[in-house]
Amino acid sequence: MFAPIGAPGMGERASQNFRSASGFRDLLVHAVKVLVLSAYQRRPCTSMLRPREQKRIKMRLKWMCLMKFCFMQNNYWDTQRRFTGGMHNVPELATFDAWLQHWRVVHWRLNIISEILIDFQALVRMMKNLAGQCHFDFYPVCTHCVQLVNNWYIAEFKPHLEEETEWWKDLVKPRMGNPVHEIEPNRKSQYVESRRIPPPLNGDEFANFLHVCQCAKLAFDVERAATEENFEDALDTLEEDFYDIDSTIPKRDLLAADARVVKRAFTLRRKRRPNRTSVYSMKGQPPVTFSASDLVSCLGQVLSTLPTVKMDREAIEDQQDHLEDKQGGEILTTPQFIEVLRKKKREVREKEFDDSTQGKLLPAEDFTLSKHDVFLANSVLDGLRKSKLIQRFAGKCATSTKITVDLTNKEEVVRYGPKELASEGFRQTFNVLNRPEYNALNKLAEAGWKEAKSVVLNLHIRSYLPQQMNAYAFCVIMWGHSSDAQEAALSGSYVYLGDGEATMLQLPLLCEYVGHNLQDFEAYKRSLVLSTVFPEFSGIADGKAMFGITSIEFTEYLPTSHAGITHERDSWDAMLRNHTEEKRRFLAGFNVVDTIEKGNRKGFSFPDFDLKAVPRHQAVVRTFEDQDVAPILSKAKSMRVKTFGSFRAGNIPVNFLGTPSNGQVASKHSVSENAGYSVGDMKSAENFVFTQLITVPAASTKGNVLAGVDILANARTTMSGFYMRWLQKGYIDTNLKLICHLPRAPFAGMSFFVLIDGTGYLAKDAPTSLNEEEILSYPLHLVTTSDVSSYEFVLDWHRYIGQVPFAEENAFLRPTLFLVACVSSTLALSAKVEFYLEAQSVGEELPRTLAPSPVLSYPFQNSFLEDLDLFLPPKRLTLGERETTIIPLSFAKSKKSGDAVLYSHAAARLAHFQGIGGVLHGVVYLVGSQLVASQSRISMWSKEQHIQHQAVNVHVDTDTGVAFDLPIKDAFYASSVYGDSGAVIQVTCLCSPMSPNAIKAPFDMIFKIRGFTPDAPMCRTINFTQRFGWFAVEPTTSTGAIKLKIWPVSNHLESEDMKVTGYTNAFLQMCQTSTMHFGSVIIHFSWTLFGGTTNAATAGGVVTIAEGFGPEEENFRGHCRNLSIYEGRATVPLELGTFAGPTPLKKLDFKYRNWIRFTTPKGRNISSIFCAIEVLPGFSFYGRTGSPRLSVVGTTVPPTADASTSNSQGGDEDIGDQYSAALGRGRGRGSRPGPSPIRG
């Protein structure tokens, strides 16, 4: 026990100890005991020490006491429970960094305490009596006092200070620009005022006891620290960092205290004392003890905590600046390096990441780095490294590690490559990623570091393109010392440049010998290169700055080859298995780890391309003003990079992604890499589905069906592995890639359409020929021997059907392909041609549901015009004649074939508009033999132009297939889509078609309209876009009872004694040209009476509108209304669909469906019945197909069960024959005999 206050001999004993050799240590112990006693009895400690003792001790103890004062609360609660049994009004202790800033404000401005801490007037008077010195043992440590003082300081000296908050998290997706309405931020300050009651100065025994425990623990810490080496020097240095000489005013900003300075005073070797020492006890209570391990834990919190206050955005952005100061590097322990990685991720930790471009990203709370992610887990070895026992007893350990963090690139700019270096529609550029400087590397080599391993490369991209621009790039980190792109490619990712920025954390794991790097430092500087592949962008000039990069490289230096604590990339699959269940941080991609990218819901199709290696023995192109550019060596081997859709579940080894495209640098002992051979995709064997032999005659006529390919039947016959998997799952779970195994034959002139019939509407008749209008109304893919890239295409189920087909039964889907000759042969082949059509499974696994998004949904928008894929009829130019071809923009008009009317999906979309303005995007294909050539100019104007006027207009000159973008230019600024007036596409022959003497074939070409970039003010819709006329019925005076039944499909009505008129409108055209449709509508009936022959006084009658489900005899009814015949109108809602949701365009014999029945017993009194359909928002369309053959509207057709004048009450009319979705009457294919049954 300590002596009571005022005990005799207290001061004399302290003076004697002060003069002895160990006096200072004893004096420290004595002074702390005095502080504890004075705190417990609430008496000033100055009355218990002499002035010279106070002066000697004051500066030595001040900061040491402050450092550990507030980290003792961890053990206070145990003490509380033992002595008091629990108390509810326990004051909340402040953290060390908050209390440290608080104490400095009080120490600086003691006179403001009386104004702020009103409840602590006695404490203020006591502190003022101490000659202006703020004594920590009297000052409360609760958060209440800390908050009061900090609020005063901020309001007095930092009025501009604003705490950074996460108010932007209230926005669901803050990527689409500023919100229209102002959003009140949900701000929550970091300084939250405590609601707990502050401890009173007197009367609360537990508060007094808690304060004593704090001082007692502090006394024990001071006694231990005083025995360490350099204790006095550390305190002197620490004191000079914060105060001027003979001054109590802090030199630094009070709210910018940095505990790293305080940390230097405690980076001393500490001796562990495992024994427990009793420092204080209360009367009648067990003694309070503190173990050495508790104190070490307390010091660990001090050393690992770096208190900072976030003031503004600039302060947050400055967190990266300290990385540049580490260019030379410093020796970091493993936990410290992990902390560096964590700090780098704090900027993006709370951001919202949805789906990566080709892989699913992690939620923010899972997106963290741990020791097991980057380093080998070895707790014993890590403990020895942290305690430095390895170096102390064995000198420099063979497994020691030095880690540096280098800001290698901060001003690098990636530019759009020159046109001269473009290849197959792509432009590849190279940018060197800087490495550590020569002097820094030389010092490391002199210090004994042998190897340098590049562990992590953090690449940040800042786009210079407009927001939401549909622009993508492929960035890959390459090893600069290999001419084989297969070996040089380390890691890479697709990047969407329309969202402003992107970050990629990659693991190159490139290890190099430091001595060799010094010998050939120029080669070392080019060891890591960023290669960027851009697709061709129209309108972007060569050398345009596309984005800037900043790269941060984490390098591990090793003294021996045995050293290293990072994960070795022995097996990507093993690393994936080790991290999948815990954090799933290894994602799908091109050896990409943690790809971070915003706004990845933008859909895009990045085609395959050849990736070139870094050129050898020449400077990497970094600017585009230099004229002397050395050519790329012909012996460089490129790699074919393919799409990554099928690899969403995991990482992709490099050798699965592509193969060399040429083999000039191949080993002569390797068969797979010999010159002249192409290495196949080794995963294609697993993706095989079926093959079918196709026979093409030597000469064919336009419209001839060369072959029909029933996809399910072929897969069922082949019984491949994928088909067995489809049977297990019950549906086709992937898209199909169709490959035509044709040779490169540009002079053969063979071309054909692949017609995609998802519902099997054409397949039921097994046609041998189709007319041109019917072919162009279906989705098509053009295959021509003049372009080998057309030999492959992907059959996307969601695009062409709207859902995945069932594996075994056709049901309402029978996906069938027809190979149809697009033009008549003008240059006959010497013999028939036989080739195989192969199907492979590609892409990610598809869900067994509808497509995630429909192809179109109401209300109609201008953006729906961007994706049309409309083929125009082939154009033929005669040899030796210079002709001009005019193509009007009347793409919404229907096409007639005999007595039938045909629509395409693109025409149905355009039918919603009167006219459009903007930019037209198209492609022209050469479908004939390249033995016949011509030069053409393509432009657009309101009428045919002279060649001189055409030259100054926007135009495209071409002699082969080319894509073009033409702005719509017309006197009305817009063009009619129905052909009344407007702009035209003009194709002028700059050179008439020419060929060798023996070749008399004409020049054939086909235009494809990809879509329009609409100019919103110039896209004028028709007057009605939500309400359309459906049909009209005109009874006669001989008509009896009228009974009309409306089914939940876009059907038509037929009658033998009533004239039925089906109206043409954009909505029904969309229903006809989509595989499925689904949504809610409102049916509007209106009718009129005969004006001349019907007497209104005696007419009478009632109209009944009933709703029901299934056969009528089961009386499963809904609402029923009886209306007077004089009311003239009625409205009833209806949902178009089936039990499965969407309504397909195929006959389904479903009895149990919703229906609406319109009946009246006196049909002769009604002159006409008009029915309109109002489409409600959300009505959706799925898939694309061609419309059925529709007869001319307004004629009378044979009777069916859809409309009847009989009084039959039977249920036969419920048999489902309404799924034809026809707009008129008169089925039949014209060229084929006999009427065609209802579709399906």
Curated annotation (Swiss-Prot):
The keyword Transmembrane helix does not apply. Keywords: Capsid protein, Host cell junction, Transport, Viral movement protein, Virion. One of its GO terms (biological process) is transport of virus in host, cell to cell. GO terms for cellular component: host cell plasmodesma; viral capsid. Pfam families: Nepo_coat, Nepo_coat_C, Nepo_coat_N. InterPro entries: Nepo_coat, Nepo_coat_C, Nepo_coat_N, Viral_coat. Gene3D superfamilies: 2.60.120.20. Specific enzymatic cleavages in vivo by the P1 encoded 3C-like protease yield mature proteins. Residues 1193-1240 are annotated as: Disordered. Virions are comprised of 60 copies of the coat protein. Belongs to the nepoviruses RNA2 polyprotein family. This is RNA2 polyprotein. It comes from Cycas necrotic stunt virus.
